[in-house]
Amino acid sequence: MKKILVTGGCGYIGSHTIVDLLENGFEVISVDDNSRSTTYAMGAIEQLTGKKIRNYTVDLKNYDATHNIFSENKDITGIIHFAAFKAVGESCEFPMKYYENNLFSLINLLKCVQEFNIPHFVFSSSCTVYGNPDSIPVTEAFPVKKAESPYGATKQMGETILQDFSKVNSTSSILLRYFNPVGAHPSILLGEVPLGKPMNLVPAITQTAIGKLPKMFVWGSDYPTRDGSCIRDYIHVCDIANAHTLALQYLIEKRNSTNCDVFNLGSGDGVSVLEAIKMFEAVSGVSLNYEIGPRRSGDVVAIYANNDFAVKTLGWKPKYGLNEMMDTAWKWELKLKNEKIGV
């Protein structure tokens, strides 16, 4: 059984990926400093899989503490690196916090990868690396343009660091550029536990619907899109999680064409903010109180994926549609309220 280290394992995507890894026969350890997550996910993972996961409560910016994880686990086969700050708007307000956290943690990990000869590394990247693309859908061959936010810039820099690292080390790597993960595990035992105000659309929708927020804002209605609001590619978190398992299997089986392959992870469908709101209202039966606000700094106008490369090469096939994304997100929000999770 191959051991995988998941960074950010208590977080939204990390926790769902741990479940998928365990269901596919991997052994998993986690590291998460819980600065933007809670330990709730570890209990939910055990409930779903029957397996207790060790989580190291370590800040990856602390090199010595990070190094100790590798010293205690010299049989790590691969790393999936999720741990990062990820809010576009916040990154525009506090850019140095994002550069320090997202880049120092990656560099410390790669120092340990080099010392302990870890063979496989999967990097959680983002469609933000494409900036405002000249056309859509975007393929992996599209140029990486000037980032629209410091968050996007940290993902671009992280990709460059890993590509340069892979040229001179034996570690095989994959960059997974994913679009907008939403929804919750279909069991509704696991989902995104909110800390502070929501930074992304779907948590803002569900928290407004349940009354946690008095209203939500649609940032911008004058974009050159079909209804004036931004267009995004929403993908169910379980589909994203499964792609990470497939990416690791792809590396372990030595099917990679280069030492650092790149894949888009999106549904391939562009959905506007207003269309997402309408879908939620249809699924939940709740009418949302929302207000049109000004454009928000750092937001890309429209982007969605061409996912052909991941589908053909990894054998990945997204299973969940937008209605299921909204349905599981809403059921999870109801669970959060009823069970006072994250309060």
Each model region followed by its residue ranges:
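Short-chain dehydrogenase/reductase
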Residues: 99, 148-156, 191, 195-199, ...
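Short glycine- and Lys/Arg-enriched binding-loop motifs that mark or flank ligand-binding interfaces
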Residues: 4-10, 127, 148, 179, ...
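Short regulatory "switch" loops immediately downstream of catalytic or recognition motifs
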Residues: 66, 183-186, 247-254
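C-terminal substrate-binding subdomain of Rossmann-fold SDR/epimerase-dehydratase oxidoreductases
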Residues: 58, 204-343
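N-terminal Rossmann-like NAD(P)+-binding domain of SDR-like oxidoreductases, especially those catalyzing
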Residues: 1-184
